[in-house]
Swiss-Prot record:
Record's bilayer topology term: Single-pass membrane protein
Designated name of the protein: Sec-independent protein translocase protein TatB
One GO-annotated biological process of the protein: protein transport by the Tat complex
A GO term, aspect molecular function: protein transmembrane transporter activity
Family listed: Belongs to the TatB family.
Function per UniProt: Part of the twin-arginine translocation (Tat) system that transports large folded proteins containing a characteristic twin-arginine motif in their signal peptide across membranes. Together with TatC, TatB is part of a receptor directly interacting with Tat signal peptides. TatB may form an oligomeric binding site that transiently accommodates folded Tat precursor proteins before their translocation.
Species name: Psychrobacter arcticus (strain DSM 17307 / VKM B-2377 / 273-4)
Length: 229
């Protein structure tokens, strides 16, 4: 920190040894080291605080610049919005003026048409000898048009029926189709299995039946024994 070399330290040590003596030199060196450590700590803290302040100042400057940019863009957007509103108002005003002029131009024409219609209605109607002929002509024209449309529709239906080919059958009958049934379907569809006694497994329970079926003499002996008892 102070740019002190080894020779300077050696010179300071010799001078302190001469001035203080060998007894007070260790204590003086200890106190000097403590003071040196305190000075280093204070210097480091001051340096860190100064750097933090500088960083804060830089960040503040950057924030101020960004805020200035944001405010500038906001002012530009407001100006553009004001211009758009002014143009919209001008367009609406021009449209209203055009509508007013068109209404003013159409009103005298409508009045003239109404006046001519009123005059025509006030005039007496002249009798025309071709009234019945015109009605007959219109009726004959309607009938001819109906005949033509019916002929065309019949032709269209005939052509459509002729052009439609026979569609092949896509579905197949359910022949030779087998399905595997589950437990639920088996329980619902199949009947219950009849119970048959297992003579081989239940030997003790069915021993009398086996002996009776095996020899009729044994059955007779058993009957006689029961009677004697």
């Amino acid at each position: 920190m102070f740019d002190i070399g080894f020779s300077e330290l050696l010179l300071f040590g010799v001078i302190a040894l001469i001035v203080l003596g060998p007894e007070k030199l260790p204590q003086a060196a200890r106190t000097a080291g403590q003071w040196y450590a305190k000075i280093r700590r204070t210097v480091s803290t001051l340096q860190s605080e100064i750097e933090a302040e500088l960083d804060l100042a830089e960040t503040r400057q950057l924030m101020q610049k960004e805020l200035a940019k944001i405010r500038q863009t906001e002012a530009e957007m407001r100006r553009e919005m004001a211009e758009m509103r002014g143009s919209i108002k001008e367009f609406e005003h021009s449209q209203s003026q055009n509508l007013k002029t068109s209404d003013k131009a159409a009103s005298p024409a409508n009045q003239a048409n109404n006046d001519s219609a009123i005059q025509n209605n006030n005039e007496p109607a002249t009798f025309s000898y071709a009234y019945g002929q015109s009605n007959n002509l219109t009726d004959s024209q309607q009938l001819s048009n109906q005949d033509i449309t019916s002929i065309n529709s019949d032709a269209v239906t005939d052509s459509s029926t002729i052009k439609q080919p026979a569609q092949p059958l896509i579905t197949k009958p359910w022949e030779n189709m087998w399905f595997r049934l589950g437990a639920y379907d088996k329980a619902r569809r199949l009947p219950a299995v009849p119970y048959l006694p297992n003579y081989k497994a239940d030997i003790l329970l069915n021993s009398s039946f086996d002996s009776s079926f095996d020899s009729p003499l044994n059955t007779q002996a058993s009957v006689n024994q029961q009677e004697s008892e």
